[in-house]
Structures are given as C-alpha cells and as structure tokens.
C-alpha cells in the first residue's frame, strides 16, 4: 500500500555541491533526488501549518508571507522609535552542519508533531547518506526543501527564550492590552512597569540563523551576549564565531543585517530636551563591491553580443539585475547616495563600451520602467531598449507584515489575494531574463498568467 511504502521509504544518497561564497570559502549544498524532494514537499505541507502556529512573531526567514523587508522594518522600529541602540551580534558557527538530530526531533514533539511515523521518516531523512561524506551524525543539508523549516524549529526555542526575558515575562498585576484596528496588540503599560525593575530589556529579530538582540543599556547587552552564548551551547549544542560576534553601539558603529548596514545619527532633540537619533543605513561594503563588479560583468556582456537578439538579451539581464537590487536595497535610508556612487564609478565603462550602441530614444518604454524611471534624465537606450539608470532610486520605508495575512485561514488568504491583483515584480524579472524573441507579444501575457502567484496558490 502507499502508506506502507511511505513507512519503508529508502532515502537516496544526497548529492553534495560546493558553491563559492563572497569571502572565498565554499558553502556545501545537499541536493536530494527528485523523488526525495517530492516526499520532503509532502512532509513540509503537513508540518508547516503546525509549526507556523508556534513560531515567534519576529522570526522572518523562510516563512510564508514574510521577507527580509519585514525584518529590517522591525529593527528600524526598535532602533528609532524605542531607542534601543546597543545590538548583540552573534554568528553561529556552521549552524546547518551542527544541528543535533535528537534535539530536533524532541523539539518537533514539543511543538505538537507527535505522529511517530512522520518522526521516523524525518529521522531517516536526516541520516540519509551524503555522497563522498557518508552517513551524517548531525546537521541538516542546505538545499533540501524541508531544511529551512527544520532550521526555524531549532532556533524557535531561542526566540521564545529571549522573549521570556522581557517581552512575554509574566507580571503579578495584569495590565490592559490595547488592540489596534490592524490587529496589533500594544502592551505599553506592561513594559513601562517592567522598566522600573532590574530586568534586562531585550528584543530579538531573526532571519534564518542571522539574528540581532537589541538592548537599551550596554550593561544589559554584555549580560545578554554571555547568557546567549552559554544557552546556545547548553541547549542546542551550537558554538559562536568569536571574530564575528560582539556588541555594537549604534551611535558609533554599524551593525550589518541582511546585506544592510545600520547605525543611528543624532538629529534634533526630543520633547524632553534629550538628543534625538534617526536610523542611517546603506548597503554593506561587501554588497557594494559585489554590485559594482556585477554591473561591470553585465556591461561587458552588452558590449560584445553575438547578434542583435543577444544584445537585447544582455540588456534585459542587466535591467533584471539592477531592478532586483533597487527593489531590495531601497529600504536602506541612504541608498540614493550609494546608488549614485556606483553609477558614477561605472559611468566611464558604460560610456566607453556602449557609446556606439547608446541613444537617447528607442522602443516604447515598458510600463514597469515608465512608472519608476520614465522621468529620469539619466535614461538611455542600448540596442533600442531602455537601460535602467542605476543612480535613479528613492528610499522606500520598509513595511511590516500585515497581521491579518495568513496562508492558513480564509481571511488571511483573502488578504493575500488582494495584493495579487497585479503581476508580481518577480514575474517581470523572470520574463526579462528569458525574453521570447521569436514569438508574438500575445504569447507573453499567457506565460505570465500561468506563473502568477495567485494561480500557484489555487
């Protein structure tokens, strides 16, 4: 029977692939077979709704309807509105390779996943042979469909432990909780009462294994750093990288989170006369250099096409890359200056290599370029196609995840569908990377329709 075949499944060896990292090292990926991926997807669809109900609100990585933008918005809120200017930076050493299998299965049991057949399937999957390595005793392979969910399960205990130190700590007196129209609960009276105690104020924001703990005082940050290091070792068997971990005073230094460096700068004064601070953020130095190098690669590809169609594809690939960078980094407050610096640095190469192909007019602008870049005087055309200007970008304040959005409730799905009334920008990027040069225009919207997120959800 099918049930029996699932119970007796034999996991195939996982293919191991090393991909290069920006620092010159490599990241190991475990690539399961097609059949194993199918089974992992089935298991994921069973487990994810259960786990989602138990995850912490500020766990933003690898979760439906959440993104890096939501994590950055949460950090901005704590830094600027709450005045938490001391950050505990902790880098877990080889997180995915050091997850303890026994501990993970116990955490799943505690979260409510108590089907022993399912747990035995997961146990067998974790112990599946890895090509050229053998049978692992710990770790979950990066590259598996279910690995991100399991990573969140492991660190969910950390989220709630940090939360229990301040945010959700029980009090003797029950203070009123205000519910905003969007569903957000405000516990301001509780937190004001807690500030009069000796408790250490701390808030966690996490995206996958990258997390920040924000504190009001340096003394609290020092204690939290030591306590978190000990807790990770004792509870999860994980070590930290001392050279990548520490305490950052945002008034003096940057902290890096998800490719964005963040600090505060003094601006004006508060009502009580104390100095006011505002968030100041931009691309990390690593991301800045990577973008400059990538733009130069795209420029060379546009300068030496095999034919006109190949040149048009190179322009589309360039536009897709720049648009993706703009969409991600526009939530950095200082991104306009960063983009203009990069535009200035690559301007000479763009002019030198593409001068004979460049014009000030060309084909009709696609709507997505016309809306965002149509008013730019930096707009140029290469091979008749518009070239997105790197330096034309305005900051956009990051948004929080709407409370009502939830894939697993009818009301939440209705909210999701409201935002899908137009084509998602990721689809446009896909179409730009793979333009259909030899077909009629009428075919392209059909392809978009089949790939639209709304159809994928149905």
Regions found by a protein language model. Name each.
Residues 314-369, 373:
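Non-catalytic, peripheral interaction segments enriched in hydrophobic/basic residues
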Residues 342, 354-442:
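Extended C-terminal regions of large enzymes
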Residues 45-58, 397:
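Charged boundary/loop elements
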Residues 34-42, 86:
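Duplex nucleic acid-engaging cores and interfaces of nucleic-acid transaction enzymes
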Residues 3-17, 54-58, 63-66, 70-242, ...:
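Conserved polymerase palm-domain catalytic core
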Residues 39-47, 150-154:
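Active/ligand-binding-proximal structured segments within catalytic/core domains
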Residues 440-458:
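Histidine-centered nuclease catalytic patch
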Residues 127, 132, 236-307, 314, ...:
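A conserved non-catalytic segment of reverse transcriptases
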């Amino acid at each position: 029977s099918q049930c029996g075949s699932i119970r007796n499944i034999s996991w195939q060896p996982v293919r191991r692939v090393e991909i290069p990292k920006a620092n010159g090292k490599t990241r190991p990926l475990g690539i399961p077979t097609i059949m194993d991926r199918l089974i992992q997807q089935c298991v994921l669809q069973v487990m994810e709704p259960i786990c989602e109900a138990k995850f912490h609100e500020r766990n933003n990585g690898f979760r439906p309807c959440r993104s890096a933008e939501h994590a950055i918005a949460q950090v901005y809120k704590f830094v600027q509105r709450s005045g938490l200017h001391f950050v505990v930076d902790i880098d877990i050493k080889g997180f995915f390779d050091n997850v303890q299998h026994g501990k993970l299965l116990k955490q799943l049991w505690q979260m409510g996943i108590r089907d022993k057949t399912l747990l035995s399937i997961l146990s067998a999957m974790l112990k599946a042979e890895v090509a050229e390595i053998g049978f692992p005793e710990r770790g979950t392979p990066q590259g598996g469909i279910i690995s991100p969910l399991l990573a969140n399960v492991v660190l969910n205990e950390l989220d709630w432990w940090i939360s229990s130190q301040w945010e959700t700590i029980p009090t003797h007196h029950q203070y009123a909780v205000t519910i905003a129209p969007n569903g957000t609960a405000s516990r301001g009276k509780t937190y004001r009462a807690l500030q009069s105690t000796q408790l250490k104020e701390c808030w966690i924001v996490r995206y996958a294994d990258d997390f920040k703990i924000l504190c009001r005082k340096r003394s609290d940050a020092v204690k939290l750093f030591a306590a978190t290091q000990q807790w990770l070792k004792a509870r999860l068997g994980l070590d930290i990288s001392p050279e990548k971990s520490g305490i950052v005073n945002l008034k003096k230094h940057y902290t890096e989170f998800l490719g964005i460096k963040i600090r505060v700068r003094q601006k004006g004064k508060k009502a009580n006369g104390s100095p006011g601070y505002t968030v100041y953020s931009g691309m990390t130095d690593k991301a800045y250099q990577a973008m400059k190098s990538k733009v130069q690669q795209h420029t060379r590809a546009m300068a030496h096409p095999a034919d006109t169609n190949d040149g048009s594809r190179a322009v589309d690939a360039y536009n897709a890359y720049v648009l993706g960078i703009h969409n991600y980094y526009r939530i950095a407050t200082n991104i306009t200056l960063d983009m203009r610096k990069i535009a200035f640095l690559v301007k000479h190469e763009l002019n030198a290599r593409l001068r004979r192909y460049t014009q000030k007019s060309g084909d009709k602008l696609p709507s997505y370029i016309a809306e965002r870049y149509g008013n730019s005087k930096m707009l140029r055309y290469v091979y008749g196609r518009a070239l997105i200007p790197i330096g034309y970008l305005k900051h956009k304040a990051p948004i929080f995840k709407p409370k009502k959005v939830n894939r697993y409730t009818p009301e939440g799905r209705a909210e999701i569908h409201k935002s899908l009334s137009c084509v998602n920008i990721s689809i446009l990027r896909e179409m730009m990377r793979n333009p259909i040069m030899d077909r009629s225009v009428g075919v392209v919207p059909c392809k978009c329709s089949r790939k639209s997120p709304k159809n994928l959800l149905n």
